[in-house]
């Protein structure tokens, strides 16, 4: 990996990584490559699922097109609706179904006491889709990511949180929303069978991103 970085093409991502140094000297760029490549697979999954959501929800698609049209030229556009769509795809279908945590203090539960230092598995699929707590558990709600309400809901952990938060959160949101904007700027996307859902129906509890099929046609000018 080090040899590949040393001969990386100028202007490439590999060249940028090779020139990036850790101020403390504790992290070598070549040691990060495998981790980032391994961790990028969920980035593709959330992008495909978000495209399925936007393709099947005309209101969100229209809002996304309007924000793309209003984006100033000359730099990366702000795409809040598309970013929110990506975040909502991670709420509906978390790429990490279980989070591993450790309790920091003795805790009293209905069934007994939990000692500090106990390992816990947090089921994100259950927390994100708890229909006893939220009426819209199985429906698309991008606005909760725009008005700040999702950030205040500690049960929503699309990119984990605390010291274990995903360091690639902003990179995934940027790349995924940019890919969606590029696809939707000049094209109309339609979700094709075998998957089928729409804005009026409850969204499925499971969605295999690599089984999704889309039809693309040129959007009207």
Feature annotation, model-predicted:
Residues 1-221:
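Cytochrome P450
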């Amino acid at each position: 990996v080090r040899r590949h970085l040393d001969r990386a093409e100028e202007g490439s991502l590999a060249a940028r990584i090779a020139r990036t140094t850790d101020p403390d000297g504790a992290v070598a760029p070549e040691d990060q490559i495998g981790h980032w490549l391994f961790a990028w697979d969920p980035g593709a999954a959330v992008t495909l699922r978000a495209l399925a959501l936007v393709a099947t929800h005309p209101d969100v698609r229209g809002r996304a097109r309007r924000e793309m049209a209003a984006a100033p030229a000359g730099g990366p556009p702000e795409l809040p609706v598309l970013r929110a769509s990506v975040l909502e795809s991670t709420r509906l279908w978390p790429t990490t179904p279980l989070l591993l945590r450790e309790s920091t203090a003795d805790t009293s539960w209905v069934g007994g006491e939990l000692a500090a230092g106990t390992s816990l598995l947090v089921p994100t699929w259950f927390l994100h889709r708890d229909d006893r707590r939220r009426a819209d558990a199985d429906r698309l709600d991008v606005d909760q990511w725009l008005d700040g309400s999702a950030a205040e809901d500690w049960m929503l952990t699309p990119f984990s949180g605390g010291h274990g938060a995903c360091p690639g959160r902003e990179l995934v949101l940027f790349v995924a929303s940019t890919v969606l904007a590029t696809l939707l700027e000049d094209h109309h996307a339609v979700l094709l069978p075998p998957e089928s859902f729409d804005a009026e129906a409850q969204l499925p509890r499971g969605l295999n991103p690599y089984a999704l099929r889309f039809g693309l046609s040129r959007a009207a000018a």
